[in-house]
From Swiss-Prot:
Positions of short motif KID motif: 643-645
UniProt region (Hydrophobic), positions on chain: 388-408
Site (Cleavage) location in chain: R230, N231, R240, S241, R246, A247
Descriptive protein name: Outer capsid protein VP4
Family according to the record: Belongs to the rotavirus VP4 family.
Amino acid sequence: MASLIYRQLLTNSYSVDLHDEIEQIGSEKTQSVTVNPGPFAQTRYAPVNWGSWEINDSTTVEPVLDGPYQPTTFKPPNDYWLLISSNTNGVVYESTNNNDFWTAVSSVEPHVSQTNRQYILFGENKQFNVENNSDKWKFFETFTGSSQGNFSNRRTLTSSNRLVGMLKYGGRVWTFHGETPRATTDSSNTADLNNISIIIHSEFYIIPRSQESKCNEYINNGLPPIQNTRNVVPLSLSSRSIQYKRAQVNEDITISKTSLWKEMQYNRDIIIRFKFGNSIIKLGGLGYKWSEISYKAANYQYSYSRDGEQVTAHTTCSVNGVNNFSYNGGSLPTDFSISRYEVIKENSYVYIDYWDDSKAFRNMVYVRSLAANLNSVKCTGGSYNFRLPVGKWPIMNGGAVSLHFAGVTLSTQFTDFVSLNSLRFRFSLTVDEPSFSIIRTRTINLYGLPAANPNNGNEYYEMSGRFSLISLVQTNDDYQTPIMNSVTVRQDLERQLNDLREEFNSLSQEIAMSQLIDLALLPLDMFSMFSGIKSTIDLTKSMATSVMKKFRKSKLATSISEMTNSLSDAASSASRSASIRSNLSTISNWTNTSKSVSNVTDSVNDVSTQTSTISKKLRLREMITQTEGLSFDDISAAVLKTKIDMSTQIGKNTLPDIVTEASEKFIPKRSYRVLKDDEVMEINTEGKFFAYKVDTLNEIPFDINKFAELVTDSPVISAIIDFKTLKNLNDNYGITRIEAFNLIKSNPNVLRNFINQNNPIIRNRIEQLILQCKL
């Protein structure tokens, strides 16, 4: 039988492992002798966000605890905590803006009775009444709002660690108060925060506000042990030498320069416009069922003005982490259903690849310090009408998500003619109002953005932002770095495959059915299947190897692998059991039959669901228990062979993909039956089920438990002529009991006779199967 090709591929597809391993070793050996490009990321390698030395980050590396520094007077920067370590009693620090803010912190050692002490604050002698009855040090924060005013105690910090903190942030000055280890922050208002300076009389540390939790930890629990050794020597604050430079939005800055190379920093304001792509596929039949509504990558090209310069940009939008939904209105052919529709939600990501014709993208080969910031954008779904032949149409309507910038890397963006070195912006999602529904169905108030109409009639969505990167380029701007065009090979192959799929699908009308039956009866092997493409044996062997490598990853091969594991488990189980029947039951478990029917109720919908699940496994069951009848795989392989011979575009590179796709997608609607005496039980992949007598073709009640037993013990037969066609044939022409048996068993000779007699019912059924052989 023609399905021998599939069994042969399944058997031999794993024999190419050694060949793959040898080829891989050779490839790795070749690639490992490339020249080390130095400390710069290339566009073909990820990740690209990296900084100095071993820290993989593009941002400036700031230490959590910077110091200690020697006592000094300076104007502290905003958003940085000063952590001051007091080693004696007296004034710890003084701070003022000479306008509306004068404050000082003084320390008092433990166990001090109430007494008056003299302190020099801002050059003047001040007297304070102090007391400390605890075992810890006390720090008194005194304050006045004018240069001539009296100081009053505003806050007190009781600490065993002898640390105080001070921060300029948000128009206020923040300090710690309370008692360690539960000290907290409080603030004082000022109208002139930026001009506040500080006189520090002790060693101190600097901590960024982003690490405030660490500062809180140090205040309450003390510094790390390494900071308390005599080997730590405080430095002058001048050694910190922080230079603050705010880059302009759109400019090119020369960072460094040698004779041949220079580092250029590119800062750019950008406008990103993008749109979602989608694909809506309708099933054949009466027009009430849809196969798939899915997201696809979409390109968009546009122009905009940036600082008086006209910029041409190109974006590619794609999604990742989609959620698969489905809707099933019932098992009748006129019941509306969607096998699968995709929705993006909180667990999804949107990727937008951006390129423009500015200098920043001209030599994007070695890049570092890549950073970006983009606005968020809300995407709201529109309406899609499911145009049914009769009745009111269901409408998928609504849905919304908001895109939030989550990162940027380098990427390669493909167009029809060239590949572009681009920036890939990654966006996380949050669901938003409104929810989406399928009007006139039970699907209501779901959240996310479905793929039916994600653009809602808009030509594009738009967001603005900016990016900055440092690129290593040639000193002479006349030199150009070529883009690695080899990465377009797969893109070219995809275009070839799309053209080939269209050709294959159009050839279905040209297949002669009588020749197809004869071809389906031949034992097609790999040589005879592929010999129509190349005449030499060596090239045919090479193609067969390529097909096996691809076929090994197909759904059919994966299912066979899972079945083999289950049979191994069954064998080990049988060796520990005295009952042969238990062995058979265990072996049948891989079909999920026994498990599926164990809790079935009398509900028709439940039985429909179970039979649909079971029927998808019966292809493998039929394949390992080959009968003399014609199978769906025989027809599938025969159609594949015919189309390969007729095709003008098939080649060595496209053949593996086509054969693998054919094994998975040809004839998706399959019916299988088991036969017991004069009783037939039949199910199909759509969840329909029949039980009937051979003599009369009258239906009888379908017993799913009995069906499960028959599947275990009896051969599974492809229902080439299904029950509906048999019934139609008997009602219009009348068939004998022997003819009915032969058609039920898919006897190829009887099928050929009916076709040669131009029986319209049988011919129509075979034509429908051929039309289902689509990619």
